[in-house]
């Protein structure tokens, strides 16, 4: 190879040349056989500097370029864009960091110049082996699949729809809104949950952007295949047995239905007809029929609901499951979370001792749309005079959930508010490990509860020390430990469990090939820098599916995930991806599958017929993990080949 490399030395406005003499560097660099010329420029990243760079390259026509300047993290993309307007392929340029790694850390000018020359020599040897790569262009679909219609999913869908993007919003329940629409109040300001979310739900169902949203309730995503910009999605939608376009929401079908079953949205405290609204105020305002409860399932030819309906043809007893297929460019997972099973702690009496309720059970018992129409009653239908609220059920416990959910204490104090509002004379005891009230507004809620003279706070060390037993006409709560036993008798005991991964998180993760963390939540690409991105390109996370959080944080997640999609996919425009990707050398794979287990982006698949691995050039992020792991050495990393790296090392050591 002749002298075909042009070297550009940035003064960085004097910051670099204060320590490194460019003339000393010039003399040494021009002795390298590959270097055609050496050009210093005062401030290469400035508009004038970039103009001088492009003009000089067009005039001198080098085959390759080395730029000695600042960190590639700061301006490599700047210089690549500049080279795109010249005769030099942007990937035939190599940067050398002589500012952060030399001028800022080496005090002796002679040593600094020597180190700068070594870096440039290394880059010259490497760039001689670079290949003229081209960016990968892919067709993309602008549609987005949003899985889950809780606060995060609804916000994500609305943000995209307002921008004119089509959205497929899939919700497995017959209504939207997630858990908060079943809450009487939302901490810390005690807003009505359904009232707070109603404007968002109304906009999603009936607003100007609703035409861009295909809402599929009672539906589940069963398969997702493909990659960023091109996901093939299969959705199964259970029959509602009600024509949504004709139903007027009068509930006359429910009044006529003779069948009854435990109410799934009231925690089984009461019953509901086979056909009914999920609960009062649920949206969409549509009933649904549960085939497992309907008398027709047992062979009876019951048509009372159909006969009672004032709009003929609205009840569709012949409705069947639908299989729906869509192609989307991105996916947002907003499937929500669950609550730790209080039954795991037999000593707490949940499900065994009357009057001991989990937080979700009490949410329904205190809701006007719940089984008691919002009246708070203890066993025996009496108003409670003494109430125990147990914090941290399953939280901060290495044997269960070792984290703090950050919202349970607010829930506990919300319950305090509800009880105090409806039973003003009740005495309330909080059994707690820690009191965690993050955020700007939650502190006022804590202070209000601490100031209440009818509230008592008792700290316990371990949940195993608590015992809840059935005393005559009451529930006895005791803290066992040491020589003393503390506690008392209560009419109601409310358990506030940890927030946990949703029951279907593992199955959805396997379907999407999205990893879960050690707690079972979906794992982010980076918990701080990319908190709503999964490790699979094009699949985003929002809300409590990737960790405990409150409603404002969930809505912020929905906004962030949708904004990321709006920024990455432009309708009618191909997506450009850097070509720095790994690939398997054809015909040389041994079929060991080591690469599949180490790829953090799930970019590698295995062809059973060919007994060979292959790497998706769209999903791969060029991290090089598989290149290093391949025992046969048959995976090559574009722009970071072994030959290039060895040449770079050799240049340093020469």
Label each region the model flagged.
Residues 1-654:
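Residues forming the flavin
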């Amino acid at each position: 190879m002749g002298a075909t490399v042009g070297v550009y030395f940035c003064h960085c406005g004097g910051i670099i040349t204060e320590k490194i003499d460019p003339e000393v560097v010039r003399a040494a660099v021009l002795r390298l056989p590959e270097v055609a010329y050496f050009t210093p420029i005062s401030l290469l990243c400035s508009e004038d500097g970039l103009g001088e760079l492009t003009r000089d390259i067009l005039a001198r026509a080098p085959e390759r370029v080395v730029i000695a300047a600042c960190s590639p993290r700061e301006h490599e993309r700047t210089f690549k864009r500049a080279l795109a307007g010249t005769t030099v392929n942007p990937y035939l340029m190599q940067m050398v960091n002589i500012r952060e790694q030399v001028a800022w850390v080496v005090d002796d000018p002679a040593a600094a110049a020597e180190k700068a020359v070594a870096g440039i020599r290394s880059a010259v040897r490497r760039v001689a082996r670079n290949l003229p790569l081209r960016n990968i262009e892919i067709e993309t679909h602008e549609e987005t699949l949003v899985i889950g219609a809780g606060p995060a999913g609804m916000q994500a869908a609305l943000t995209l729809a307002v921008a004119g993007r089509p959205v497929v919003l899939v919700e497995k329940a017959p209504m939207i809104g997630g858990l908060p629409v079943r809450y009487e109040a939302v901490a810390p300001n005690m807003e009505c949950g359904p009232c707070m979310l109603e404007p968002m739900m109304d906009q999603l169902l009936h607003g100007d952007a609703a035409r861009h949203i295909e809402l599929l309730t009672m539906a589940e995503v069963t398969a997702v295949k493909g990659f960023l910009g091109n996901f093939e999605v299969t959705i199964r939608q259970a029959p509602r047995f009600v024509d949504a376009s004709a139903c007027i929401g009068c509930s006359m079908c429910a009044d006529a239905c003779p069948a009854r079953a435990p109410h799934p949205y009231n925690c089984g405290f009461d019953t509901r007809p086979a056909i009914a609204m999920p609960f009062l105020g649920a949206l969409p305002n549509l009933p649904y029929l549960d085939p497992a409860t309907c008398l027709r399932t047992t062979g009876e030819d019951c048509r009372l609901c159909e006969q009672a309906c004032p709009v003929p043809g609205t009840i569709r007893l012949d409705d069947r499951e639908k299989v729906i297929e869509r192609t989307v460019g991105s996916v947002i997972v907003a499937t929500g979370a669950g609550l730790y099973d209080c039954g795991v702690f037999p000593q707490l009496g949940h499900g065994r001792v009357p009057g001991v309720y989990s937080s979700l059970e009490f949410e329904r018992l205190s809701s006007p749309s719940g089984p008691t129409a919002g009246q708070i009653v203890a066993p025996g239908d009496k108003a409670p005079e003494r109430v125990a609220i147990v914090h941290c059920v399953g939280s901060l416990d290495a044997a269960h959930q070792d984290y703090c959910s950050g919202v349970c204490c607010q829930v506990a104090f919300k319950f305090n508010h509800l009880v105090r509002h409806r039973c003003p004379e009740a005495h309330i005891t909080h059994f707690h490990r820690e009191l965690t009230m993050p955020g700007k507004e939650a502190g006022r809620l804590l202070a209000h509860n601490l100031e209440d003279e009818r509230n008592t706070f008792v700290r316990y060390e371990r949940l195993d020390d608590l015992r809840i037993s059935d005393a005559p006409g009451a529930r006895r709560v005791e803290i066992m430990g040491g020589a003393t036993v503390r506690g008392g008798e209560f009419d109601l005991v409310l358990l506030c469990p940890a927030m946990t991964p949703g029951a279907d998180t593992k199955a959805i993760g396997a379907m999407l090939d999205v990893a879960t963390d050690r707690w079972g939540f979906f794992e982010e690409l980076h918990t701080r820098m990319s908190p709503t991105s999964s490790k699979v390109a094009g699949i985003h996370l929002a809300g409590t599916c990737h960790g405990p959080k409150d409603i404002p944080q969930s809505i912020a997640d929905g906004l962030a995930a949708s904004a990321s999609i709006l920024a990455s996919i432009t309708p009618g425009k191909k997506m450009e991806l850097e070509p720095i990707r790994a690939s398997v050398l054809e015909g040389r794979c041994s079929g060991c599958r080591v690469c599949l287990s180490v790829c953090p982006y799930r970019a590698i698949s295995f062809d059973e017929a060919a007994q060979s691995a292959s790497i998706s050039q769209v999903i791969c992020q060029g991290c090089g993990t598989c290149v290093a792991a391949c025992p046969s050495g048959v995976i090559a990393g574009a722009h970071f080949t072994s030959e290039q790296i060895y040449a770079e090392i050799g240049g340093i050591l020469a």
